[in-house]
Design a protein with these regions (language model features):
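Ubiquitin-like/PB1-type beta-grasp interaction modules and other compact soluble beta-rich domains
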Residues: 1-79
Length: 80
């Protein structure tokens, strides 16, 4: 199944692009998609547990993915 990951801020800078498409086995979870992305050398700094939104709704990392899903990785917010 194909899942589109949307990258913002520092995640976009590390990847050099604003989205990545992953081909994952059926029944994969958001955590497994993130693990696959972290295996890329330029994305190894990515937290194993970033905030995520699945199809524009905040979701837990245990959320099951389906073909065509959009998974947004939300970077930490800093500042004051």
């Amino acid at each position: 199944m194909k899942v589109r990951l949307l990258l913002f801020a520092q995640y976009r800078e590390w990847a050099g692009q604003d989205e990545v498409e992953l081909d994952l086995p059926a029944g994969s979870t958001a955590a497994e998609a993130i693990q696959r992305l972290r295996a890329e050398p330029h994305m190894s700094r990515l937290s194993a547990a970033p905030a995520i939104a699945l199809n524009q709704v905040y979701a837990p990392l245990s959320a099951a993915l389906s073909d065509g899903d959009e998974l947004a990785l939300i970077p930490p917010v800093a500042g004051g």
